[in-house]
């Protein structure tokens, strides 16, 4: 299966972001990808990061999902879209999964917020396993996979062969960009992604924005913990790669024995 990871720049408006999504979906489909994943809260943008976020309400959310569902259907590509989900309790950071026929498969809200995000968002309270072309996958959003390994293991122990990891690290004005993938002198983010893959024997597809000063790459990490492919830091575009699902056995995830650790 070929997967596509989309690294667009931060959208300057909702319409600009939608055009980026449309173009990248079409390009990924033309290159044979079965699924495409966008960064964390791409529409309308992630609050609290120093960037202006366009106004966004439930009507805007409905407009976005209708448009993206139509493009998924016309391009025949499943899509994981990082969005802001408007609920009665407040705004959530979420990822919406849309099938290649345009039907919504489900939504994964970010359950473990970074402490700095709590003034802007409310957490989700459920987790979901998804499928594309019969392949089970999970979603862990940014801080969840970086700091809470349980969010990835939850999916891996339930059969996920890959966990998609939409995130944002660094920015256009501040950030420490690694010299190379896994750079020991750089922030811990890429090393954490490597651990999530290795400790569960699954693929991790980690998706960042195209930023001037990113602190982690858009990359695919194999079940053995090696970087299969990555985009150059700060480069806008698509990372497309075929993954070997036979390698994603989930062996180490299924060997976890919680009964050996009594409360």
Model-predicted segments: where are they?
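Short, acidic/polar
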Residues: 16-25, 147-153
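Cys-nucleophile CN-hydrolase/nitrilase-fold catalytic domain and related Cys-dependent amidase chemistry
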Residues: 14, 22-101, 169-198
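Active-site catalytic loop in hydrolytic enzyme cores
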Residues: 87-186, 191, 247-262
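Short polar catalytic/cofactor-binding loops
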Residues: 7-14
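Extreme N-terminal starter segment of soluble prokaryotic enzymes
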Residues: 1-4
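Short beta-strand scaffold segments in enzyme catalytic cores
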Residues: 81-83, 94-97, 128, 218-220, ...
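Conserved residues at the C-terminal ends of beta-strands
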Residues: 39, 44, 111, 166, ...
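CN hydrolase (nitrilase-like) catalytic-core segments centered on the catalytic cysteine
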Residues: 60-80, 146-236
